[in-house]
Amino acid sequence: MSASPVKAVAIEYGIDVSYDLGWISANESRGLLGIVVAYGRIIPESMLNKTPMINVHFSLLPRWRGAAPVERAILAGDTHTGVCIMEVEPTLDTGDVYARREMELTDAHTSDSLTKDLARLGGDLLVDVLRNGLQVPTPQDGATTYAHKLSSEEGRIDWNSLSVEVSRHVRALRAFTVVDGQRVRVLEVEVLTPSSATVPGEIAPDASVDTADGAVRLVMVHPEGKGPMTGAAWLRGKGFDAPLICE
């Protein structure tokens, strides 16, 4: 197993690397500053008393504190998001903010592509903050929302939702549906023109699926036990002798 880029650089400069938080906490050496990026655990106050820490958080705090800010922003239909460099506290994402940078969140973003964009944005901002030195941070201001941890069952598509909500669901999560008892991952959909006559979950021969206000086309799917394929190819393989329903 190859070392991560961070570990490779640390080894090059003779810096100890550990994945054990207990070892780090017990170590008596004091660093000048700790940097945390997308770290999903609370850091003990005993560690923070030894070494001040800052965190690169993938949202515009206090919106989307918590474990899944990228996915929650897409699901909510946010049109803008960004990154914050914040002071780490023993409580969850409550620290004062040293710097923030905003970006547009488009209908083309998936959780993967948005994470990559935010990582680049956050990396650039972190370099700027470190280069200029930590200034006086600003307390978080505004309405607080929480990006609760995702569950696997949350990926199941509710076809009684609006088409745009189904699209967000697919772009944000490991979305899936069940057809004829088979679990099918939905990788990409296209929102179609709204229609007044729909049966949510019913699949048409053109690989479109009815929603509460219209339909989405299954562009790419990943059926259980097979590889990724187009929605049209998947339907051809199943045949179309009877109406198919996504559950």
Q: Can you annotate each of these PLM segments?
A:
Residues R168-D213:
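C-terminal substrate-binding/catalytic lobe of Rossmann-fold NAD(P)-dependent oxidoreductases
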Residues L192-E202, G225-A232, R236:
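Short, surface-exposed linear segments at secondary-structure transitions and domain or protein termini
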